[in-house]
Amino acid sequence: MPDVELTWLGHASFRVDTPGGKRLYVDPWLSNPKCPDGEKEPERVDVIALTHGHGDHVGETVDLGKQFSPKLVAIIELASWLEGQGYPNGGELGFNKGGTIEVEGIRFSMTHAIHSSAMYGDGPPIYLGEPAGYVIEFENGTKIYFAGDTAAFTDMQIIGKYLEPDVAVLPIGDHYTMGPRQAAVALELLGTKRCVPCHYGTFDLLTGTPEELRRHASGVEVLAPEPGETITV
C-alpha cells in the first residue's frame, strides 16, 4: 500500500493524500499568506479535520463544505456551529476528547490540547468548544499526531504510550503556541522520533524555526517542508 503524502500549505494547514486514495485537509486556512497559489482552490476534498475554532484554522471550511460536501471531523460544539453557518451536515460526526471515529477508512482519535477556541467578530467571542488534537491512523497503519495549537503537557506521555504516533506535527512558532524549546520537551514526552513543525513563519510574532527545534531535539528527525512541498511518511 502507498505511503501517506503530507503537503504543508503554510501556517497550520495541511493536505494529506492517504494510501487509500482519500484527500484530507487539516485546518484549511488556504488564504494564509504562505499558502501557494496553486493550493488555494482544491479540486477535491473528501474529509476536513479541524483542531479548534480560531479563524486561522477554520479558514475556508464552510466554503469547502458547500462545494464538496466532505465529512467534517471536529469537536461537537465547533461541528454544530459550522453546520449553522451552512456546512452541509456539519454536526453529523461531532465528537469529543477520548473518542475515536472512523471516517472514509481513516481513524481519528481526539486528544487534549492547551489553547483556546472561539470565533471573533463584531460582538463577544463565540465559544466553540475546547481545542483539540488528533492522532490519525491511515489505511496502511501509519499514525500521525496533529497536536493543534498547544503548549506541551505531561499527558502527552499517554498519547505516546496509548496511541503510538509515528510522526508528530507540532506548532513551534511561540507566542500563541509552544516554541521550539517546549516542542522538544513535547517530543520527549511523546517518545516520537519524527516531527513536522508548523505554525511558524506566517507572521513576525511567530519567531520559532525548525533550525532551533533541531538544536533542542537531538535524536529527532525534523522534517521541514516548504509551503506546497509534499513529503512521504
Regions found by a protein language model. Give the residues of each.
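Active-site environment of divalent metal-dependent phosphoester hydrolases
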Residues: 32-33, 54-59, 79-82, 99-102, ...
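Active-site beta-strand termini and strand-to-loop segments that position acidic
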Residues: 16-20, 103-104, 136-140
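Binuclear metal-ion centers of metallo-dependent hydrolases, dominated by the metallo-beta-lactamase
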Residues: 71, 83-101, 182-233
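Zn-dependent metallo-beta-lactamase
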Residues: 1-23, 29-34, 107, 111, ...
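Pre-active-site segment of Zn-dependent metallo-hydrolases
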Residues: 15-54, 59-66, 74-80, 116-127, ...
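Glycine/small-residue-rich loop that forms an oxyanion/phosphate-binding "nest" at active or ligand-binding sites
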Residues: 59-101, 106-119
